Amino acid sequence: MPELVPGIQQRIKALETFGLTITPNTLKIEEVTEENWATAWKKYYHPLQVTRFLTVVPSWEAYELKQADERVIRLDPGLAFGTGTHPTTILSLQALETYIRGNETILDVGTGSGVLSIASKALGAKHVHAYDLDDVAVKAAMDNIRLNDYAKDVTVKANDLLKGVTIEADIVVANILSEIIVPLIPEAYAVLKPGGLFLTSGIIEDKKELILSEQKKQGFTIIQVQQMKDWCSIVAKKPLAEDE
């Protein structure tokens, strides 16, 4: 590592060519064990009530219910995924809590840690199918599902969005980047039952109008737009046959 110091110092000095003023500084290098990186974040992660009924609890902490109708989601996000507390995740969880009535078939696209699939089962969905293009995410989701016995029948598969999926769904939920939501819109429309809902989050504020426009062009009716900090979620409905 010490042999890298001169090169780093030169690059810092070069920042002055971009008009930046570099004040006197000291470059310090020390070794940190991988185990410390792998576990240090855990001390910042504690049980958190994220919606009216849902509380996310780290897998390594004991937790007692605070209310009789509370649903607990046990989660071990590891280093690759969030803890369920990012605004985009909370917006997705709020939408699921609002629109799940019970016995639905739900498709979770870009499942990541699996938190939305687990929440769907906690809220009463009958069939939940989770998809992610990343094999690491598929494994993480499966591991987290095993932490929540009520969600043990959630299926998790590696898949590119909804390509090749023919399951008819009551709800499609996707907390993914806006650029990925756009090609998902026609795929979601195709698998949704008439009257089905498309719940999207992960939408930065300046991309909101783009997503709304694309959904409307596809034939969706917009029924709710929510915002938390710089992030938005959209709930869109596939019209019933008589509404088309």
Which ranges hold each PLM region?
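Conserved beta-strand elements of the Class I
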Residues: I73-R74, L107
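S-adenosylmethionine
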Residues: H127, L133-D243
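Short loop/helix-cap segments at secondary-structure boundaries that form the rim of catalytic
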Residues: Y63-D69, G164-I167
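Amphipathic, non-transmembrane alpha-helical secondary structure
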Residues: Q9, I90-L93, E97, V182-P186
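Surface-exposed loop/turn positions
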Residues: R52-L54, E104, G196
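Conserved beta-strand segments that form the floor/walls of ligand-binding pockets within enzyme
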Residues: Q49, T55, R74-D76, L177, ...
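Conserved SAM/SAH cofactor-binding pocket of Class I
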Residues: L79-L161, V165-E168
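N-terminal auxiliary segments of SAM/dcSAM-dependent transferases
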Residues: M1-K66
